[in-house]
Amino acid sequence: MLYSMNLQKLTGRHTSFWLLLAMVCGTLPAAGNVPAEVDPDYEDSVVMIMAVHQEYDYTTPWKKGSMGRGLGSGFVIEGGRILTNAHNVANQRYIEVKKQNFARRYPARVEFVGHDCDLAVLSVADPSFFMGTKAVEFGGIPTINSTVQTCGFPMGGRQISITEGVVSRLETSVYSHSQAARHLV
């Protein structure tokens, strides 16, 4: 199931926020020349995920695959957890999370992962990480022609990116991460 968030409280405008688009940070056309902003109450709730991963070599399992690292986006949700994409933490060896404009990184661990829907839930043992954050609220699926906003750290960017656009189509498709099921995208 795809979740979205109503950002009426975040921006003071009636907009819907499509969480999956935000985490993947697909590009949407800019809505005018006004820069998009997120309510300061939620600014620290969008976090950077840094993962060290190691691919498995299924043909020679006694050999370790090469190590790599990646960056992604996540969002603080209720229960002191972070929602992110499964592909951000797949084959992970070590995960850290960081809030925007903060230097400190916090170790995180995978609590749940759903590769078929490309979603994962992370936990952070240190409760100080969640100070100043507010759990993002889930809303319904946006309607055609509604304004949506994406925010996150796309393509390994180290600065948060916020983009607004309009929903032009809703459809189901084979999901890109697992190719195993059809989901609303």
Tell where the protein language model's regions lie, with residue ranges.
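Bacterial N-terminal signal peptides
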Residues: 16-27
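N-terminal activation segment of mature serine protease catalytic domains
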Residues: 31-85, 94, 143-144, 148
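Glycine-centered structural positions embedded in regular secondary structure
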Residues: 72-74, 108, 165
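N-terminal secretory signal peptides that target proteins for export/translocation
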Residues: 1-12
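Active-site region of chymotrypsin-like
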Residues: 45-51, 56, 60-63, 125-135, ...
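A short, polar/charged loop/turn motif at coil->beta-strand junctions and beta-hairpin connectors
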Residues: 40-45, 91, 116, 179-181
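Conserved active-site neighborhood of the chymotrypsin/trypsin-like protease fold
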Residues: 55, 78-160, 183
